């Protein structure tokens, strides 16, 4: 691995990490989730936590933070240790998304609604104990409009630093661009609370049924397409030859609804992040939306800004470290929308994300390293 670029060294300690993950002790998770489900995840964690392998990895994490992944990683569950990990990695602030328990908190059941509230109370307190350095975002179950709006009001008043919303199905059986949801977006805008969608929002890793937004699992029912490490700590998502390549489809559909449905026009200061879907899809989407807007203009449907301009202003996405950010910018522009992430402590984030992204940003230009690692991400860290 090449040495850290001088421009990256200059921003060390200021870096904003737009995708980290929060683990929970299995007993804490069981208390929060209750009857909502996820028992297999809890059982799996209980079998691992406290084993010789876990204890050895935890000890290693104190001196080799980047290499240890999963619940054994430094600060995976503990807010004080997470701050130590951030200092070690040169990161100023980090957004934390749930490691597991995605689908279970978003189904249309009373148990899911109760679990969602308990989770939100937990992460608001956790974030305070991390001195606001590590910001664990709340989750909003959007199967019922009135409940979703009431819970959003509640967590905003509690001091939520962001909210994660589902993107596998239309919220409360209608488009997120429907005027019915305007009060929801207005509250986010007025409170300066970022909204996020995240890979796995349909619970593909924790549900037997298909993710409604993605191709049926039968398409990947082949030995050569199955997950690479389904049982490895930190590899809970279906990382493999198929899933990661199609997982961005949910983000494309949701973002298309918001842009073409006028949500960012009605709420110009709304902050929105599409997290861990990668970034290679964003430039082509912008091109398609701009072309379609030009066609619509010929029949009297007009947008004050180009769709790509709304995206550059309001939306941030997290490239994977294997994606050539410099090439994407050369081809499509949209440089403002790309932000840094580690995926820590998930294994997909790798051990050298700062160096790898630094090599790419250096090829873009002298100023882009600071933009990518710090300035672009400020939209998601009000």
Listing of model-derived features with the role each one plays in the protein:
Residues 2-16, 25-93, 121-129, 150-153, ...:
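Mid-to-C-terminal alpha-helical segments outside catalytic/metal-binding sites
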Residues 23-26, 94-96, 102-107, 144-148, ...:
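Short catalytic/ligand-binding loop motif for oxyanion handling, primarily in non-cytosolic enzymes
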Residues 65-74, 83-106, 133-139, 161-165:
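Divalent metal-dependent hydrolysis catalytic cores, especially in the metallo-beta-lactamase
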Residues 72-80, 115-121, 146, 173-186:
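Aromatic- and glycine-enriched glycan-recognition loops and surfaces
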Residues 112-126, 228-229:
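Active-site-proximal gating segment of KS-fold condensing enzymes and close homologs
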